[in-house]
Swiss-Prot record:
Belongs to the IlvD/Edd family. Pathway: Amino-acid biosynthesis; L-isoleucine biosynthesis; L-isoleucine from 2-oxobutanoate: step 3/4; Amino-acid biosynthesis; L-valine biosynthesis; L-valine from pyruvate: step 3/4. This is Dihydroxy-acid dehydratase. NCBIfam families: ilvD (TIGR00110), PRK00911.1 (NF002068). It is an enzyme of class 4 (lyase). Gene3D superfamilies: IlvD/EDD C-terminal domain-like.
Amino acid sequence: MKSEDVKLGIERAPHRSLLRALGLNTESFQKPFIGIVNSFTEVVPGHIHLRQISEAVKEGINAAGGVGFEFNTIAVCDGIAMNHAGMKYSLPSREIIANTVEIMAMAHAFDGLVFIPNCDKVVPGMLMAACRLNIPSIFVSGGPMLAGRLRKNDQVSCVDLNSVFEAVGQVAKGQMTEEELLELEKVACPGCGSCAGMFTANTMNCLTEALGMALPGNGTIPAVDSRRTQLAKSAGQQIMQLIKDNICPKDIITPDAIHNAFSLDVALGGSTNSVLHVMAVAHEAGADFSLEQINRISDCTPNLCKLRPSGPYHIENLDQSGGIGSVLKELKPWLKNDARTVSGKTIGQLADAAPKADNKVIRFASNPYSPKGGLAVLFGNLAPNGSVVKRSAVAPEMMVHRGPARIFDSEELATKAIMGGKIKTGDVLVIRYEGPKGGPGMREMLTPTSLLAGMGLDKEVALITDGRFSGATRGAAMGHVSPEAAACGPIAALQDGDMINIDIHNYKLSVELSDEEIQKRLANVPVFEPKIKSGYLKFYTENVTSASTGAVFKD
């Protein structure tokens, strides 16, 4: 056992003395040491209840003959960090999470790890750490929040955080009163858990099942459901079996597992952020995978779910309809069914054991919403290295669009123009210098897209950015444009009025300019000057790579 480095031999007497100070006895030193990587915090609704999850994990570890040690890492709430300087720190927190877990696991010689994430950057940060450390590991998330219930005119409707973001646009356009907004604000987020739709956090927790790193139910069992606590206890027990069998993350997260994750992703219509994060996980796992492969998967994999923001359903509905297992069951013809999972069974075996889909929340593969998946990576002279769009959330009339560019060099400038009613039907908003380096931190453009949707412009206006979008974004929103403006990508050459062509059906994103004109303009673009010159974001700006490679650090 790896933990023998801190507990066996005469020279480890000082180490054992310190461990005895924790309450361990001689018998404890014969057992595997398990690190419980918690991300509890009192400022994130998705993480406020994770102490309960951790206690259940400890029970499972103890019952199976191990010794559990809980430690924490950080967690950022993207909703609270949205639309101010805090959003610059959200994506960069992913690398901090991976690094802190690496430090704690190596310093204390754990034999295995149980990861307890829930929200956006915590899941991929922990997955990256698991691959980097490559010791037996298992994930159990905190689970999704229930949808809120809003009573209006004797009718009750389901609402969520995205409802509030879009309502701000309705208020700005005079379609909702501030009093009505307040009533919505009070009920949209009814308690603990990751925000209730197929937003980034829930996308990543669902994909963790398809990657093989979590037990069935991880992605969909609600945070307040007792099955969530039972799942946590089972994860604590299962880590002991993984240690016994010496099954490590790189045995599980292979190119086949990445294929399965993206197959599930496009079937669900998951968040565009998943592309960024799964590519980063693949990088840490040494699993070679390209953006072009995502399009090949999406071309042949049906879109089976319309979950918020793409449709009316929430994660609790997905769970009631069979959960991720039922989706995988429909996807079996497109999966790498022999891929391993932490359950000890293959992904195909788990799919076989799942209940049949209901053909409502989870459609049959023979009756999909679309024969093609919900995500697409667009290429062209505006995005030579790719740009990501959630096509399942794009209105049919915007799948092909041609319009004049409206250039904004920050999210704030674009938001001001939208709120001021200065955006016209047909416009293509371009928000640049918001990429990994340029932002820095690749902020989410949820406020601009929510305002457009709330004002009813999501079927008339497109938005392109080298920044990111929230999983709650809907509309013709193309993000992750690579290379970014700060790296002198073609997006930096755009001027107001340039005609932009979007063809999601054929994976194209281009500007009606010759290559010579683009290069001529780029030659006159000033050298990018970092916006932040101290602290962690200075380090981040100097070391982060392109969104097309997952925005990981330079090797």
